[in-house]
């Protein structure tokens, strides 16, 4: 992601004053106006914390660490900092989420459409599963459908697990160099409705991350895609 973000940033007239790769010590140039973090689940929290403690606005798209999000929010409030987080910076994914949420809202009043399942496909280098985007979309569904209150995930060719009536099943696949595919199936005994978003590359994610960085300038607090795009 770093190379894609750098290309987009340069194309929009920005200067990249530092690059930190995996295993390198985190040193942030005083010339920095914002830090963009796309790292790993085990390093993201410390990266974000160090940047915020240094007084730098932070944009993060790293997934798999958000059980500590409350600590980051408290730090942002305490230091009057700025933090923008999204599990997926694609504008198309945000549109997809909006469509899924509206479909779930409609189907909550149609008991025959009570069967919802999800599938996400990513490249073999993605360490966490289900994807952060899949969990976010699942949260959208849970917020609109009374039937569901929890999720259950399984990976690849593992045996399909049994699920409780209130559990939304997510199937995660890791294949080749797939940038990202998310599918939602809403079914009845008579038919099924499928919604899908497929990314063709990393450019859309990179553009969203740079847009978020631009949006964050001069602001204080915690923000997400809904704050920047105002689709609701």
Model-identified regions with their sequence ranges:
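C-terminal substrate-binding/catalytic lobe of Rossmann-fold NAD(P)-dependent oxidoreductases
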Residues: 2-32, 112-232
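Hydrophobic beta-strand scaffold residues
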Residues: 16, 58-59, 82-83
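Rossmann-like NAD(P)-binding element
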Residues: 29-46, 56-60
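Glycine-rich phosphate-binding loop at the start of an alpha helix
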Residues: 41, 45, 97, 203
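Short glycine-rich anion-binding loops that position phosphate/pyrophosphate groups of nucleotides
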Residues: 41-42, 64-65, 88-89, 175
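Rossmann-fold NAD(P)-binding glycine/threonine-rich loop
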Residues: 46-49, 53, 62-86, 94-105
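Short beta-strand and adjoining strand-loop segment in the mid-core
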Residues: 90-91, 104, 123-127
């Amino acid at each position: 992601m770093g190379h894609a973000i750098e290309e987009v940033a340069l194309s929009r007239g920005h200067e990249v004053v530092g690059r930190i790769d995996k295993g390198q010590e985190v040193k942030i140039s005083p010339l920095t106006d914002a830090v963009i973090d796309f790292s790993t689940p085990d390093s993201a929290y410390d990266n974000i914390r160090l940047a915020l403690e240094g007084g730098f606005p932070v944009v993060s798209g790293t997934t798999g660490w958000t059980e500590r999000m409350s600590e980051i929010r408290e730090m942002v409030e305490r230091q009057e900092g700025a933090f923008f987080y999204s599990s997926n910076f694609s504008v198309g994914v945000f549109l997809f989420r909006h469509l899924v949420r509206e479909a779930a809202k409609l189907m909550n009043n149609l008991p025959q459409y009570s069967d919802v399942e999800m599938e996400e496909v990513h490249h073999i280098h993605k360490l966490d599963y289900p994807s952060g985007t899949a969990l976010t979309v699942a949260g959208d569904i849970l917020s609109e459908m009374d039937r569901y209150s929890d999720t259950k995930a399984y990976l690849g060719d593992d045996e399909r697990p049994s699920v409780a009536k209130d559990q939304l099943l997510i199937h995660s696949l890791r294949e080749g160099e797939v940038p990202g595919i998310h599918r939602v199936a809403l079914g009845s005994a008579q038919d099924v409705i499928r919604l899908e978003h497929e990314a063709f590359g990393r450019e859309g994610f990179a553009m969203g991350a740079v847009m978020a960085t631009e949006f964050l300038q001069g602001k204080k607090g915690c923000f997400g895609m809904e704050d920047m795009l105002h689709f609701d």
